[in-house]
């Protein structure tokens, strides 16, 4: 299931689009305020960001520009402003698309799916190149299997549903099994940005991943916390 953060201050529009996308296997978090959008996006680390332009606190163009320096996923502007100048500005700010709210829902869905597919393929290709894996090599740790081509994770013969962001985090940890990965390394490898000492999105994502992989929340033994250093994927904890 793909995850989306939709920054939209019109509650009716946000609800309608979120409900439509949910019917098509997309999990949508609606954030109504522009000045809280960046915090929500970095915390949720979604597969795609959908942005309105006219927002309270901070406009969508500025959010797009500021976010692009910290987050590498697809950003799509969804707006009622039918202006060539705004369209051009959005692309220059780092958006991958500019879609009008009058666009039929089915067309919106198709375009979002296109950007999600393109991002997944680009991320997978980058990961395979960096780890020098053959195209068909899955990783196996006891009862855990991670298939990078089909992007499928199974634990004790049960498929685990992971978002693209969660899969990439698991893949990054698993390909460095037994090694301590600090927040800076994880952020650089996954998003291309440095850790600023305040960003807690990695901690939130690790917590979410542990829950899905049935790790012990109180005393994690599969994805361990190494105090003041980072996180360690334990290769022998998956029996």
UniProtKB/Swiss-Prot annotation:
One of its GO terms (cellular component) is protein-DNA complex. Keywords: Cytoplasm, DNA-binding, Phosphoprotein, Transcription, Transcription regulation, Two-component regulatory system. One of its GO terms (biological process) is regulation of DNA-templated transcription. It is found in: Cytoplasm. Induction: Induced by low extracellular levels of magnesium via the PhoQ/PhoP two-component regulatory system. InterPro entries: CheY-like_superfamily, OmpR/PhoB-type_DNA-bd, Sig_transdc_resp-reg_C-effctor, Sig_transdc_resp-reg_receiver, WalR-like, WH-like_DNA-bd_sf. It comes from the Bacteria. The keyword Glycoprotein does not apply. Member of the two-component regulatory system RstB/RstA. This is Transcriptional regulatory protein RstA. The keyword Membrane does not apply. The modification 4-aspartylphosphate is found at residue 52. Gene3D superfamilies: 3.40.50.2300, Winged helix-like DNA-binding domain superfamily/Winged helix DNA-binding domain. Phosphorylated by RstB. SMART domains: REC (SM00448), Trans_reg_C (SM00862). It comes from Escherichia coli (strain K12). Residues 3-116 form the Response regulatory domain. GO terms for molecular function: phosphorelay response regulator activity; transcription cis-regulatory region binding. The lineage of its organism: Bacteria, Pseudomonadati, Pseudomonadota, Gammaproteobacteria, Enterobacterales. Residues 136-235 bind DNA. Pfam families: Response_reg, Trans_reg_C.
